[in-house]
């Protein structure tokens, strides 16, 4: 399977105690290009700009098992629960492949809880509508037996079966009140220190 590189050219605006966090772009890397260990540099291919129709014809879950979020604070590598939450992983990968996540930021940062991104509204400097954007559709929850703990990659939602594009990475040791309410579709395998750096950034009242 291949690894997908999310290239959050993470732009951090640290002004007056406020933070506009992560920007993302995505590029696929074939299995033959994967590093032997997480310590090696993952090669980056040219930015992908495929049309949605082309991507929709491809089963991306069978091709990509991981993704790398590249930020200006370092890289975050996540591994997917592709066999347990296939629809969620497929949705994430298709949005990534079509460039939907390009320029999106981690718009919500809550210390000792989580960092959240994936909202297209966060691409600009208008804070007022961050957190309410999406891809224009919603899809059902896809729960599994994995608990939401530190490092978990999960879908943000506004209630049952309202998944779209927003996701979050858990920083708390455990979050039992979220289990069975948010689809857990992966986990951080490298770069949790980067997640912690993002979590430590100053925020504003929107967080």
Language-model segment annotations:
Residues 1-4:
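Positively charged n-region of N-terminal signal peptides that target proteins for export
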Residues 7-8, 17-207:
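Cyclophilin-like peptidyl-prolyl cis-trans isomerases
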Residues 11-12:
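Repetitive helical segments and hydrophobic/amphipathic motifs
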């Amino acid at each position: 399977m291949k690894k997908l590189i999310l290239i959050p050219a993470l732009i951090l605006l640290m002004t007056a105690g406020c933070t506009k966090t992560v920007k993302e772009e995505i590029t696929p890397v074939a299995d033959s290009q994967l590093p032997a260990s997480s310590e090696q540099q993952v090669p980056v291919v040219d930015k992908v700009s495929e049309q949605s129709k082309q991507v929709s014809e491809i089963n991306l879950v069978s091709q990509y098992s991981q993704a790398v979020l590249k930020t200006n604070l370092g890289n975050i590598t996540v591994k997917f629960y592709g066999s347990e939450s296939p629809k969620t992983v497929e949705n994430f990968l298709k949005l990534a492949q079509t460039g939907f996540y390009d320029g999106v930021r981690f718009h919500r940062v809550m210390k000792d809880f989580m960092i959240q991104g994936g909202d297209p509204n966060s691409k600009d400097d208008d804070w007022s509508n961050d957190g309410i954007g999406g891809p224009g559709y919603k899809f059902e929850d896809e729960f599994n037996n994995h608990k939401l703990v530190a490092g978990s990659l999960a879908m943000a939602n506004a209630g049952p079966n309202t998944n779209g594009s927003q996701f979050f990475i858990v920083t708390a040791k455990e979050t039992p009140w979220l289990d069975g309410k948010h689809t857990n579709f992966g986990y951080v395998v490298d770069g949790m220190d980067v997640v912690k750096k993002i979590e430590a950034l100053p925020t504003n009242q929107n967080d």
